[in-house]
Amino acid sequence: MSENKKNSQEMRLKIKKYLELDNVTVLAGAGTSFHLGAPIIREVPEGLKPKCKDSITEYFGDGANPSYEDLFNCLQADKFLKEKKGESIDDINSVMVEMQKWLFKNCDTQKTSIHSLYNDDSQLSNNRYHYHEVFIKKLLQRPNNLKRANLFTTNYDMAFDYALDKLGVHYINGFMGIHNRCFRPEVYDYDIYYPGQSVSGKVHRAEKVLRYYKMHGSLSWVATESSPSNVYGIQEKTMDGSFEPQIDKQIMIYPCVSKKTFTLDLPYSELFRQFAQAITQPQSVLFCIGYSFFDEHINDIIYQALSIPSFTLVIANFKINEEIQKLKDLNDPRIIVLDPDDSEQSTFVGFVKNVMPDLYEENEQLIVSETMNKLYPTRQPVEDDKKDIIQDVNNKENESE
């Protein structure tokens, strides 16, 4: 067996044990949509700069090159101040709408071109959401007696939404209603059961259910006027091609990812609270996939969770950066950083194909491996790996008691 194949097998076995913990949370960043051609936005895109030139000069000076988030944050703050003074905000609204239109157009993964690095991938040629679907299928293979898995994403795009819909997975995303879907945070506490067949009246939890949180908002979220039936003034629209941002109906995005002093309002305060609650439960594991650790709010919550002895952090992000290197340098056995230079492990596509286990298949292989180890007692590498990981998990349980 080659060294790379052995390492992949060991990593899959380790990931399998973590997926079978009671509290499993995934944080998906921009890297999970990279292969679909969705942009990773840092600076104001060149195609948008002419429409934002005056605002950039006003807030940052001539020749400045601010981030998309910083510019949008300044526009929001200026809009708030002018509204308080009773001044016109038409010019600000027009720039904000143009920025959101650009985002809406370029983050629509139904229309983006598959990244050139994946032009030869036949799976993507047949189904652009193939890897999102496989990822979800594997995540839902966890035993049904465990708590629901949590999927958090910082992405505005609809890639996971489309994949969940295609698979027929019911996802609890904080909205209620059919024709008029409004944000109601209490929905996150709901679950889905169906009556059992026994005469004892027991109920059984439905399968194919996932808790889904879009921490920075979504292309499908629209800010509207509050009403008795929509207290928070947030609607979820169907992405059928008939909607685009307007001044009176702007899409909901949260651009202030680098501003820790920004006051979080609903729905973002609720989404961040849910994230903190999810990863600070005993025996929790957090998989950060395609997340570059550029959001200080999220990072603070993750760092706080590291104070819990039984918490495990798994990072899969192609190309290392200062923040991930800092975590790696801690040499904490609870922090697992997949090789950031190996695209077969640390990209979303590579992680789904080579690292994330198929729990059904792995269980069958484990049975076969155990049988072979009994027949040939001198060959025990897989069994030893299994024991090491079980011991690791047991040690964490003892530490948390």
Enumerate the predicted regions with their spans.
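Extended, H/D-rich, highly charged conserved domains that either
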Residues: 63-93, 100, 142-251
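Flexible internal linker/loop segments at domain or repeat junctions
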Residues: 231-273, 278-281
